[in-house]
Amino acid sequence: MENISVNNLVEEFESSLPREISISIAKNILNSKISKENAISEYKKNIGLLEKKIQRQVINCTGTLLHTNLGRAQINPRFTGGASNIEYDLDQHKRGERNEYLTSSMNLLLNSENVCFVNNNAAALFITLSTVKNSSNIKNVIISRGEIIEIGGSYRLPEIIESSGLKLQEVGTTNKTDIKDYEKALKSNPDSILLKVHRSNFSIKGFTKEVSIKELKTLSTKYKAHLFHDLGSGLVIDRNFLEAKEIDIFNSEPTVQESLEDGSDLVMFSGDKLFGSVQSGIIAGKENLVKEIKNDPLFRTYRCSPLILFELQNTVNKYIDKNEMSIPIWSSLLMKYEELLARVDDISKKISIDHKIFDSESLIGGGTMPDKKLLTPAIGIPSKNIDEDLRILSNQEIPLIPRISEDKIIIDVRSCPVEDDEKIIELLNKL
C-alpha cells in the first residue's frame, strides 16, 4: 500500500485549525502505524472533533435566555481591539485611575458609594470575605441554613467561605429562619458578619419564613456587624419601566438598588445574568469597604480586562439612558407574544420540512428565577434521527442549537435576536 505523509494529510483535507495543530494531529496518527485508509478516516475525525471545540458564535434556539453553556447574557460588542485609555487620563496626559468613568456611572445607576469589578460573582464573594477577615479581624459568617446554596459547576457556598479563611455558622432551619436566630449567633460570636444569599436558582414554598435586609440591618447596627448581600442575578432595572411594560414576573426579585437602600453594606452580583452584560462580578456599597477590597493584594489577581470593563461601561450607559430594550436580555424577555408569532410564522413559510407551530415556554436560565416561564410560540420538527439532525445543525460555520423534546427538534426564537432568523431558515432547510 502506498505510504501517506503528514503533508499529504494536511494539504488534502482543509481545516480551519492552525496548520501546526493539523500537522501535530497527522504526526500522532501516522506514528500509530495504522493503514492508509484508517489514517485518513482518523485524521478527518480528529480534525472535525477539534474544530467543534473552537469557541464560536452559535444561534441559541433553546428558549433558555441566559443559557449557562452558551455564555449566559448575549451582548452587542462594541470594542474590537486596539489600545484603550483604561488607566490614562486624557485631560492630564498621564496615568489615571483605572475605569474611573465606569465606577462613577455605576455608582449613579446603583446609588452606591463605591463599586469595584472582578472576574465573576464567586470571586466577588471570596475577595469580599477574605478582605474583611484580614482587615477587621472577622472570624465567622452567619447565614441562614436555607440560603446555603449550590449553583452550576459545583460552586458550593460553604467551600467559598471556608477558602476565605472564615468559619460558616448556620442559623435557623431550611424552611424557617427568624431574626432571633441571627441575634443569638451574634451574641455568641460578635466577631462575625451577616451574609444574606438570594436563592436565585431554587425556591422554597409553603411553611416558610426568612429575614429581610431591613430587619438584618437593624440587628447589624445594634451589634456593629457588617451586613453583606450576595444577590447573584443582579436585577438593576427600574421598577417603573417594568410596570410600564406590564411585566410582573420580577415583583419578588430584589434589585441591587433596593438591597443597598434597605441597608446592605455591600452587595455582590453577576454581570452576565439579569444585568445583561459580560461575565464579571460587581461589588457595590460602602466607600470604605470597597476601598479596602481594591487595596487588597488579591484584588489585582481578580480584576477585569479592558474588554470586560468596556462592555460593562456600554451596558451601564444603556441603563442610564433609559435604553433598556437595546440590552439583549431585556429585548428577549420583554418581546411580546405577537412579535414572536410573526417571526415564527415567517420562518414557517420559508422552510420545507414537516413542522408544526405550537405554544411553548421559554426559561430565563442562568440559575435565575427557575419557577418563572414565558409563553412563547415555537416550531416543532418531528425527527426520525435526532442525532443526525443535530449533527447537521451543529456542523455549520454558525451552528444552530435547538431544544430537544421527545422526538422533536424545538426552535424557540425568544432566545435569539431577529437578525438570526434568515440563518435559521437556511439551516433548517438543510435537514
Annotate each language-model stretch with its function.
Residues 36-75, 104:
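Long amphipathic N-terminal alpha/beta scaffold segment
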Residues 341-419:
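Conserved C-terminal alpha-helix-loop-beta "cap" of PLP-dependent enzymes
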Residues 94-316:
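Conserved PLP-enzyme active-site core in the AAT-like
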Residues 26-27, 31, 61-62, 71-93:
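Glycine-rich phosphate-binding segment of PLP-dependent enzymes
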Residues 15-31, 57, 190-192, 318-319, ...:
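N-terminal glycine-rich anion-binding loops that anchor highly charged ligand groups
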